[in-house]
Amino acid sequence: MAAAEAPRLAGMVVALQANFLEVELETFNPSSLVSWRRSTDAEPLRLLCTRRTRLDHRGAAVHVGDRVWVEAIDWQERRAVVGDVEPRQSWINRPPVANVTAVVVALAVKQPCFDADQASRFLLSAEQTGVDVHLILTKRDLITSDQLEQQLVRLRGWGYRPMAVSVQTGEGLGALKNKLSSTRLAVFCGPSGVGKTSLLNQLLPQLSLRVGAVSGRLQRGRHTTRHVELFRLCEGSLVADTPGFNRPELPADPRKLAVLFPEFDGQIEDYPCRFRDCFHRDEPGCGVDKSWERYPIYKRFLEEMECLSRSSRGGSGSGLL
């Protein structure tokens, strides 16, 4: 008679600690836990895990957000081994997070000052993921209601529906939490110093994440979050705080740049231009309206890609790859 197969449980990787993985179980049998207490039954169980060497042999890297199967479970020590990884539904490279369902781009209205170029870089990075993109304006209390309305109208012109929040007054936090509760895994990103960590501390009062100050000279925040970790917002909804950085990279393929700008929606779907590979600059027969605010930013990004393309080819040739 064959030996009984060792039990396996499904979970999600919520943090990486050196060579260990922290896995939050999706389902488990409380009666199997020797040290489990009913006082903690409101919190999902997390196990500290290593990983099977066969995953390395298969080249199966494991990252935060991955759905995994754990085995060889030691309930008393709350340890286990990750034996297998489920296929990913989505993937973000920077920071590395799997199975993201929404990206929340956080931008400050002030301190640091709103920078349209920098904001566009973060939004383009978010659009590349192919998941829902939400735009949040932080530090709403630092500007007047009229100034805020002007900024909201401006960003609606970019094709977004921004939400304004204030950690100091609590304004907008309830609406933001309701929005995030409908998504499985939301990643927060944005420049350092815009208040992502402070915002998460308000959304998740049980946390105590370190908060960094904003440097006065450059108006850039000192990085506070050093690693990616998932936190439970409510049943079925997780959020991730990610290391802040000030200048995300532009997309690798310039031909895909236009579709990452919502302002192009409806303009290029039916190919109004004479040439299907039109870059919407000065090409003959271009049918795209160029009167929108971020069009100069779009052109600058294309020029930057052109310079990078030439550099990668040793300075020879012209045009975009």
Curated annotation (Swiss-Prot):
Q: What does this protein do?
A: One of several proteins that assist in the late maturation steps of the functional core of the 30S ribosomal subunit. Helps release RbfA from mature subunits. May play a role in the assembly of ribosomal proteins into the subunit. Circularly permuted GTPase that catalyzes slow GTP hydrolysis, GTPase activity is stimulated by the 30S ribosomal subunit.
Task: State how the cofactor is bound.
Answer: Binds 1 zinc ion per subunit.
Q: Which family does it belong to?
A: Belongs to the TRAFAC class YlqF/YawG GTPase family. RsgA subfamily.
Which gene codes for it?
rsgA
The listed locations are:
Cytoplasm
Residues holding GTP: 138-141, 190-198
Location, primary (coarse class): cytoplasm
Necessary cofactors: Zn(2+)
| A GO cellular-component term linked to this record | cytoplasm
SUPFAM superfamilies xrefs: Nucleic acid-binding proteins, P-loop containing nucleoside triphosphate hydrolases
Which InterPro entries does this entry report, sorted A to Z?
G_CP_dom, NA-bd_OB-fold, P-loop_NTPase, Ribosome_biogen_GTPase_RsgA, RsgA_GTPase_dom
Q: Does the keyword Cell membrane apply?
A: no
What interactions and quaternary structure are annotated? Monomer. Associates with 30S ribosomal subunit, binds 16S rRNA.
Q: Does the keyword Cytoplasm apply?
A: yes
Domain annotation CP-type G: ranges: 89-248
The entry marks the following residues as binding Zn(2+), namely: 273, 278, 280, 286
List the protein's name: Small ribosomal subunit biogenesis GTPase RsgA
**Pfam families, per the entry:** RsgA_GTPase (PF03193)
- Highest taxon of source: Bacteria
Single annotated GO MF: GTP binding
| PANTHER family, sorted | SMALL RIBOSOMAL SUBUNIT BIOGENESIS GTPASE RSGA, SMALL RIBOSOMAL SUBUNIT BIOGENESIS GTPASE RSGA 1, MITOCHONDRIAL-RELATED
Which key words are in the record?
A: Cytoplasm, GTP-binding, Hydrolase, Metal-binding, Nucleotide-binding, Ribosome biogenesis, RNA-binding, rRNA-binding, Zinc
Q: Which GO terms describe its biological process?
A: ribosomal small subunit biogenesis
State which Enzyme Commission number(s) the record gives.
Answer: 3.6.1.-
Matching HAMAP family: GTPase_RsgA
